[in-house]
């Protein structure tokens, strides 16, 4: 029997101290990493529930274990809600991550050596879309599409390359592209060359759910996503597809790639999907766009080049070369100022991926805190002040105090 008062603090104070320190960091630091966000207490309550105790291999109504009648309800709620959210015919909510969701699609329709077209990683693509370092790049023949001289996706060149190479699959989506994808055009290109079309909307899913970014579901055979980032749920993945692919996707998630689903995480996904169906979620996403746009504008006014010249989403890249800084240096400097970003390659970056010439900035987390345009401008000016004065330790310390004071005005979790 477990005692009700057997807390982490009592049983494992060393671990409890590390958790408490991270909670304090999240409250005290301005979070600008585009892929990070804060989940609601309800999402965390579901993820920390006794559902973690239950094995449930299989799918609702078709399990390999007994005692699944209640987790069947949980998983079906998640399925029904995410289908409603994105207008999908079919959904699988079991993938443990976005990467595993992508792998399940690949295994459903591809054979080793098949040709796959994805966005160039150096132009903003994602590792799982064909990077040589990833399983996708090791198993398949990868051809890339990228950006033109205006740092916008070149759809005409994409079509030309697709006609020449005849890929079996074309992938839309990115991890560091600020503009909108033309999913309709990409779907047309895929049909023209006889390819499947998959969209990884991990970064944009919350905006899509709110109707503020193009919905790929009507145009794609498969749509994958994470459930955190802009969607503001737990860390995990989903797959949406046309109904004809249900059997193939289900069998490739389980048993090909995974065993038992994480029903406590699926419950947390169900909560997040319900949150995303509320009117307040659209208001939140509208503010995400406003905050990203005003930060990009402010940084441009302070002399920093914004890749692609603007943002049409929650994210944008900043080219640091004019400041004589690398992304690695800027990441460290801003961290000292209690502002968290990540170094990121820019198109045709002369630096290595571990150094980079840019940083990636996103607005989802600060918007969850309650920041609006005034605070976003203040944050952008703090960033610019640090980048303008990388050797001024006193200024960086003052900005750290200022950043923490701003955070305390907008706590993530009210006491």
Swiss-Prot record:
Pathway: One-carbon metabolism; tetrahydrofolate interconversion; Amino-acid biosynthesis; glycine biosynthesis; glycine from L-serine: step 1/1. Its cofactor is pyridoxal 5'-phosphate. It is an enzyme of class 2 (transferase). Keywords: Amino-acid biosynthesis, Cytoplasm, One-carbon metabolism, Pyridoxal phosphate, Transferase. The record marks 228 as: Plays an important role in substrate specificity. Its EC number is 2.1.2.1. Catalyzes the reversible interconversion of serine and glycine with tetrahydrofolate (THF) serving as the one-carbon carrier. This reaction serves as the major source of one-carbon groups required for the biosynthesis of purines, thymidylate, methionine, and other important biomolecules. Also exhibits THF-independent aldolase activity toward beta-hydroxyamino acids, producing glycine and aldehydes, via a retro-aldol mechanism. GO terms for biological process: glycine biosynthetic process from serine; tetrahydrofolate interconversion. It is found in: Cytoplasm. The modification N6-(pyridoxal phosphate)lysine is found at residue 229. CDD domains: SHMT. Homodimer. SUPFAM superfamilies: PLP-dependent transferases. InterPro entries: PyrdxlP-dep_Trfase, PyrdxlP-dep_Trfase_major, PyrdxlP-dep_Trfase_small, Ser_HO-MeTrfase, Ser_HO-MeTrfase-like, Ser_HO-MeTrfase_PLP_BS, SHMT-like_dom. (6S)-5,6,7,8-tetrahydrofolate binds at residues 121, 125-127, 352-354. Its main location: cytoplasm. This is Serine hydroxymethyltransferase. HAMAP family: SHMT. GO terms for cellular component: cytosol. The keyword Coiled coil does not apply. GO terms for molecular function: glycine hydroxymethyltransferase activity; pyridoxal phosphate binding. It catalyses: (6R)-5,10-methylene-5,6,7,8-tetrahydrofolate + glycine + H2O = (6S)-5,6,7,8-tetrahydrofolate + L-serine. Belongs to the SHMT family.
